[in-house]
Structures are given as structure tokens and as C-alpha cells.
Amino acid sequence: MTKNVRKSFHTDSIKKTIMIKASKEKVWRKISNIAGLSSWAIDVKKTTYLSKKRRNVGAIRKITFTDDNTIEEHVVAWKEEEYFTYIATEGLPLRAYVATISIKPKNKKTTQLTWQSYFNSKKMSGKQFMKFVTLMGAFYERSLENLKRSLEK
């Protein structure tokens, strides 16, 4: 006998913050290179531009993960040396995904970085969705730790 699992849409958000012992300018240089994601995000094999624009609103990147899954992301907001916001248009089991990476100097040598996102799933079970949320949270945390290590060298 198979159990009938009810599938529906789910919504959640993730917010992860880390303190980095590096100047705001150094942190911004690293994160604002949107095709440089593979230098600090875990399980990212490569990131390529899909647009002529490399920075600011309208820049588009394609992320290829080590398992060969891909995600397409479009920058939709940008404030130099403060934040950028992007949406995923392909590659996730979601109907909507918007994320912002922002920085705030705490002093000349320490910067607070926050990565937060909101998402709404395609139809899936609650258990599947919670697994996805856990995976995304771990991806953010481990990637931010990598970023911190690379900037504090």
C-alpha cells in the first residue's frame, strides 16, 4: 500500500550573517564579481556570464554545480559597496527565489555580511521542502565560512 503524500506550495526565508576581518572594500570586490562565485561558494564548479553586463542591474550569471545542475540568476538591484539582489529564473525547484547579499562595515577592518533569501516552492511535500530549506541553509553557512577564510588570509 502506498501512502498518498499531499503536495502543496511552501514559502520560507533564510538569513545568514557572518563577521569578516577585512575592509568593506575588500569584501565588496570579492562578492561583487558575480562570476567569481566558484572561488568561495561550496559545490560550485564554475560561474559564467550570460550577459554582456558584468555588474549592476541586468547582469546575468549561470552557475554550474559539481553535480552538473545549473541555475540562472539575474541581478535586479545594486547599490555599490552595499548590496546586490538577484533572482533565480531557472534550475531550482521553486516558483520564486529572490536573494540579497549585503555588507555593512563594523569598523575599518571588520565587515558584517548578510545573505538572505525568500522563496516559494513548486508543489512538493512538506518533508521535501524542509529538506530543501535545510540544504540551502547549509549551503549559505558553509559558503560564507569559505568566503571568510579566503578574505582573512
Regions found by a protein language model. Name each.
Residues 112, 119-153:
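A conserved amphipathic terminal alpha-helix motif
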Residues 38, 65-110, 118-121, 149-150:
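Hydrophobic-ligand binding "helix-grip"
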Residues 17-21, 48, 62-64, 74, ...:
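Generic structural detector for well-ordered beta-strands
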Residues 1-51:
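Hydrophobic ligand-binding cavity/cleft-lining segments
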Residues 2-6, 59-62, 87-89, 101:
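Short, P/G- and charge-enriched loop/turn segments at secondary-structure junctions
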Residues 14-16, 59-61, 73, 99, ...:
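Hydrophobic residues positioned within well-ordered beta-strands of beta-sheet architectures
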Residues 1, 43-44, 54-57, 81-87:
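Short Pro/Gly-enriched beta-strand edge/turn motifs at strand-loop
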Residues 47, 61, 84-86, 113:
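Well-ordered beta-strand positions enriched in small/hydrophobic/aromatic, beta-favoring residues
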